[in-house]
Amino acid sequence: ITSRTTNFLAPKTPVSRAFRDAVLQLAADFPFARALVNSGRLSTATIHADSPLSSEFNGFDGGVLPGGPCPNLPIAADYASNRPIGFLLDVLGGGFQGLLFAGDEAEVAPATIAALRSLARAPVPVETFVVSQRSGASRQFKGLVDAEGTTAKAFAAQSGSYYLLRPDQHVAARWRNFDPSQLEPALARALGKPAA
């Protein structure tokens, strides 16, 4: 925690306290004020190493480990809805999510697209996002633009890599080269169920 964070959390002067209180009050309704809240890094997400709910396929050299928290990285825009996003965790909802890394959706095998579309309609749906360095790469799924390649680098992903994220935004499974036939067993494992 920095001294600036400490001063925000425990103001030393009446002016600092008035500033902090105004920021907190405005932050409830105005995004610009949220950026002024300085709470520091008061907690760190737990890495659930060796969790029986996690799976690893096709060995990675680096990236986010199964059981590890999804990093909050900048994403330019969601071109499926033309909505600016800002950061990856702002996109992820309360269900299972998938990140498919691809230079272009044309690089994704039709069998993979069919499997992911089927899983999106399953009893426990998985919503897949195509992460690409350019806009318009996805027509089947929500497209996330990783213009600088920051997200792909953090995940040690290449075109064809896939990450399955749990509802708590931790990695359930990852594939260096995605194999759709392994997705349902990995999802069952993440749910604590025996694979069929």
Predicted regions and their residues:
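Helical substrate-recognition/capping region of FAD-dependent monooxygenase/halogenase enzymes
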Residues: I1-A196
